């Protein structure tokens, strides 16, 4: 579960390292984001001379959560960190690489470009 003020690792090569969630997009008053949900965040830590700078406000999709996610077949999946990939307004990733595994739930939410860039899909 990702909520406001949650710090996430950025799992792409846009230059951002840490992202803080400031809004969960969706219906009015939505509190938590899970795998495949879009959030608005502010970059808290970034590499120099890269496209994304510190204090930039960006959209991102959650690809890994520490909170357990239950699948319809009864299987539970959990990751070691909370991670997101920065996306543009069209829903395409701004980076050209994705680091670490991503969840299969992203395919159901039409983030197939992120799935194709990922080295491993769980």
From Swiss-Prot:
Question: Which GO terms of the molecular function aspect are on file?
Answer: large ribosomal subunit rRNA binding; structural constituent of ribosome
> Sorted alphabetically, which keywords does the UniProt record give?
Ribonucleoprotein, Ribosomal protein, RNA-binding, rRNA-binding
Q: Does the keyword Ribosomal protein apply?
A: yes
Q: Does the keyword Ribosomal protein apply?
A: yes
Q: According to the UniProt entry, where is the signal peptide?
A: none
- Taking the record's annotation, the residue ranges forming a coiled coil are none
| Highest rank taxon of the organism | Bacteria
Which Pfam families did the record assign?
Ribosomal_L14
> An example of a Gene Ontology BP annotation on this entry?
translation
Q: Which GO terms describe its cellular component?
A: cytosolic large ribosomal subunit
Instruction: Report the PANTHER family cross-referenced here.
Output: 50S/60S RIBOSOMAL PROTEIN L14/L23, LARGE RIBOSOMAL SUBUNIT PROTEIN UL14M
Query: Which proteins does it associate with, and in what oligomeric form?
Result: Part of the 50S ribosomal subunit. Forms a cluster with proteins L3 and L19. In the 70S ribosome, L14 and L19 interact and together make contacts with the 16S rRNA in bridges B5 and B8.
Question: What family does this belong to?
Answer: Belongs to the universal ribosomal protein uL14 family.
The function of this protein is: Binds to 23S rRNA. Forms part of two intersubunit bridges in the 70S ribosome.
Task: Write the protein's name.
Answer: Large ribosomal subunit protein uL14
Origin organism is: Synechococcus sp. (strain JA-3-3Ab) (Cyanobacteria bacterium Yellowstone A-Prime)
């Amino acid at each position: 579960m990702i909520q406001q003020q949650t710090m996430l690792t950025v799992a792409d090569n846009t230059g951002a390292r840490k992202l803080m969630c400031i809004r969960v997009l969706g219906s009015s008053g939505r509190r938590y984001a899970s795998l495949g949900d879009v959030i608005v965040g502010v970059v808290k830590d970034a590499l120099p001379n890269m496209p994304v700078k510190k204090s930039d406000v960006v959209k991102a999709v959650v690809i890994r959560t520490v909170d357990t996610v239950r699948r319809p077949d009864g299987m539970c999946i959990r990751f070691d960190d909370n991670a997101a990939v920065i996306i543009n307004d069209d829903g395409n990733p701004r980076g050209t690489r994705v680091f670490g595994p991503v969840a299969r739930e992203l395919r159901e939410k039409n983030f197939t470009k992120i799935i194709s860039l990922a080295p491993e899909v769980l």
